[in-house]
Each structure stands twice: as structure tokens, then as C-alpha cells.
Design a protein with these regions (language model features):
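Membrane transport/envelope proteins' first extracytoplasmic loop
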Residues: 1-185
Length: 185
């Protein structure tokens, strides 16, 4: 299941806000992340291992388990000379690379969708298990949500109109920081 789009808001949505936004015919999925600087001079956007939408494709190794394992984007690994079993360090914490993955919503590694060139040398994406993700302080979380349409759009015009409805609903409920429908990604 690949998202139809995602958005980021300033503060975590509460149940009432999620319910209101979902009334436009979507299902919302938490897709929170942190941006973690590593000692090798790079930054990884770290997500909790996804279960329902934008699920990882394991290219080699295994998905991370425990609190010291991390699976990283294959292209980021290649460009930084990293392989399964290597150690990455961030803020004094050592992470063992358990696997190399691809995330369907990051086929090109843009840290910001306004960038004109993707950067798989300095930026990458990664996943960690729920118990590892829970160790990040809440004030570091970026509140991103992915959505799927309850009834998929029939044509490009409907794709754009439905995305506009989602954006309007989010704007009525929260402070929108970014909004990326699939057709712009």
C-alpha cells in the first residue's frame, strides 16, 4: 500500500482532528519521524517500522529488532560504503545496520520536496522498531501523516480535486507545514 499523499503538521493530531479530516474519504496513518545527525556527517530520517502503508522492501539482511538495530536505505548505504553489520553512531548511540531497504515513498532521496536534486550522500531514510522509536524525545518528532483514499480517484482531475479536499480539511484543523499529494511526489 503506497500512500496517495502525506502532510506534516506542527502538533500531533488528536482523535477529533483525525476524524474530521478523514470525513473527506480517507484513512490516515501516523508516519512520524525524526531527523538524526550521524557521526559520518550525514542525516537519516528515521521512521518506526511501517506496518500498514509505505511498507519497506527488504533488499538484504533483516528488518531491525531490539533497540540497537536500524535498517537503512540501500542507495544511502551504497553511497556511504555501508553494509549489513556496520555500526552507525549518533549522539553517542551505536546502531547496527540490520538490513538494507527501499521505502516506496522515498524512491528519490529528497530531504525537502522543494529540492531540485536528491542527495543520497548526505541524506537517507531508515526504520527502527517501535521500542527504539519510542526512545526519541517527543519534542524531536515531526508529525507526518500518510493517507489512502477510501475510494480511489478515477482520473487525474479527480486525483487533484480529492487532494485539494484533503488539504482544505487539514488546514481547517491544524497548522499545516507541508503537503505532498502523490501526483506531486
Amino acid at each position: 500500500n503506497v500512500e496517495y499523499g502525506n502532510f506534516r503538521v506542527e502538533k500531533k493530531l488528536n482523535k477529533a482532528q483525525k476524524k474530521y479530516i478523514s470525513k473527506v474519504g480517507i484513512s490516515l496513518y501516523d508516519n512520524f519521524y525524526v531527523e538524526e545527525p550521524f557521526d559520518n556527517g550525514t542525516t537519516l530520517r528515521i521512521f518506526q517500522t511501517r506496518q500498514q502503508v509505505n511498507t519497506p522492501c527488504l533488499m538484504s539482511g533483516s528488518l531491525p529488532i531490539g533497540t540497537d538495530q536500524i535498517a537503512i536505505d540501500r542507495m544511502y548505504a551504497d553511497n556511504n560504503g555501508l553494509t549489513v553489520g556496520d555500526i552507525l553512531t549518533s549522539n553517542g548511540k551505536n546502531w547496527t545496520v540490520s538490513g538494507l531497504i527501499a521505502l516506496p515513498d522515498y524512491s528519490a532521496l529528497f530531504q525537502d520536496n522543494n529540492d531540485t536534486m536528491f542527495d543520497s550522500l548526505q541524506f537517507g531514510v531508515a526504520i527502527v522498531p517501535e521500542e527504539s522509536f519510542a526512545q526519541f524525545s517527543e519534542d524531536r518528532l515531526l508529525y507526518s501523516y500518510s493517507w489512502l483514499y477510501d475510494t480511489p480517484p478515477k482520473d487525474e482531475e479527480q486525483v487533484k480535486n480529492m487532494a485539494e479536499d484533503v488539504m482544505t480539511a487539514v488546514n481547517q484543523e491544524a497548522s499545516l507545514e507541508s503537503f505532498v499529494p502523490r501526483y506531486l511526489n
